[in-house]
């Protein structure tokens, strides 16, 4: 089993558990250059709010889009957008990535912004 297959297996397991709970989930996708985050409703799978380093507003604020500082900015942004939509509690879906580095920085920033995991 290669690295990507193992990550996808972990992600599927986590998503199944979150789906059984029926709560709103905060899902993260990470690439070497960018980080993306979405808040997804459990019932219909619709995206309620999203943020990423690809957005021009965030890109202008950042010197580099693939580091912890960028993840912190995205975490704060998603927390603001979730509050605006009336969402305070989410389940954190790290998509099989280790809770370390940029993923951890994003989660901590979202918590500081007012989201509860």
UniProtKB/Swiss-Prot annotation:
It comes from the Bacteria. One of its GO terms (biological process) is translation. Keywords: Ribonucleoprotein, Ribosomal protein, RNA-binding, rRNA-binding. GO terms for molecular function: 5S rRNA binding; structural constituent of ribosome. One of its GO terms (cellular component) is cytosolic large ribosomal subunit. Part of the 50S ribosomal subunit; part of the 5S rRNA/L5/L18/L25 subcomplex. Contacts the 5S and 23S rRNAs. Belongs to the universal ribosomal protein uL18 family. NCBIfam families: L18_bact. This is one of the proteins that bind and probably mediate the attachment of the 5S RNA into the large ribosomal subunit, where it forms part of the central protuberance. This is Large ribosomal subunit protein uL18. It comes from Nitrosococcus oceani (strain ATCC 19707 / BCRC 17464 / JCM 30415 / NCIMB 11848 / C-107). The lineage of its organism: Bacteria, Pseudomonadati, Pseudomonadota, Gammaproteobacteria, Chromatiales.
């Amino acid at each position: 089993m290669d690295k990507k297959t193992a990550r996808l297996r972990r992600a599927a397991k986590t998503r199944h558990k979150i789906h059984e709970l029926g709560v709103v989930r905060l899902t993260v996708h990470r690439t070497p250059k960018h980080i993306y985050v979405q808040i997804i409703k459990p019932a219909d799978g619709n995206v309620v709010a999203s943020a990423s380093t690809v957005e021009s507003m965030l890109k202008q604020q950042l010197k580099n889009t693939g580091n912890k500082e960028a993840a912190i900015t995205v975490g704060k942004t998603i927390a603001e957008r979730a509050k605006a939509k009336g969402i305070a509690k989410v389940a954190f879906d790290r998509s099989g990535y280790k809770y370390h580095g940029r993923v951890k920085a994003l989660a901590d920033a979202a918590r500081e912004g007012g989201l509860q995991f």
